[in-house]
Amino acid sequence: MSRRGTAEEKIEKSDPIYRNRLVNMLVNRILKHGKKSLAYQIIYRAMKKIQQKTETNPLSVLRQAIRGVTPDIAVKARRVGGSTHQVPIEIGSTQGKALAIRWLLGASRKRPGRNMAFKFSSELVDAAKGSGDAIRKKEETHRMAEANRAFAHFR
């Protein structure tokens, strides 16, 4: 028996303008070299651009995009008897959101364009519509899991 207590689950703080945890998660993921104010600037500019493009609430577009990109299942490499198998595993909601945010930011960084706010807003709008690189990444992950369904018993 371990004598150490279990770690308390940290509650994500919400951002100052939208009072939303998702926005704060985005800011913390987009952050580079500790420049948090720049990260906030990028996110808020992207939200303004989404507001201008879609003429709807940018938070609802953000939620819809993240819901569309969040994977239900993924593959994990597992070594069994000298060979490595890709074993499909279910993903929890927190980990799924984190993956979705990572994929959205990665896809927007790869996009050609002027600045990060513009690229990120375009990626979010595309993801909310059901297209874009991040959605393709999710579908690819689901295909991989489906193809390796035979190894599900190695869990």
Curated annotation (Swiss-Prot):
GO cellular component terms, alphabetically, are:
chloroplast; small ribosomal subunit
Residues forming coiled coils: none
Q: Which InterPro entries match?
A: Ribosomal_uS7, Ribosomal_uS7_bac/org-type, Ribosomal_uS7_CS, Ribosomal_uS7_dom, Ribosomal_uS7_dom_sf
Localization terms from the record: Plastid, Chloroplast
Q: Does the keyword Lipid metabolism apply?
A: no
A family per Pfam: Ribosomal_S7
Q: Name one GO molecular function term.
A: structural constituent of ribosome
PANTHER family per UniProt: RIBOSOMAL PROTEIN S7
Function of the protein: One of the primary rRNA binding proteins, it binds directly to 16S rRNA where it nucleates assembly of the head domain of the 30S subunit.
Similarity comment: Belongs to the universal ribosomal protein uS7 family.
Q: Quaternary structure?
A: Part of the 30S ribosomal subunit.
Q: What is this protein called?
A: Small ribosomal subunit protein uS7cz/uS7cy
Q: Which organism is it from?
A: Cucumis sativus
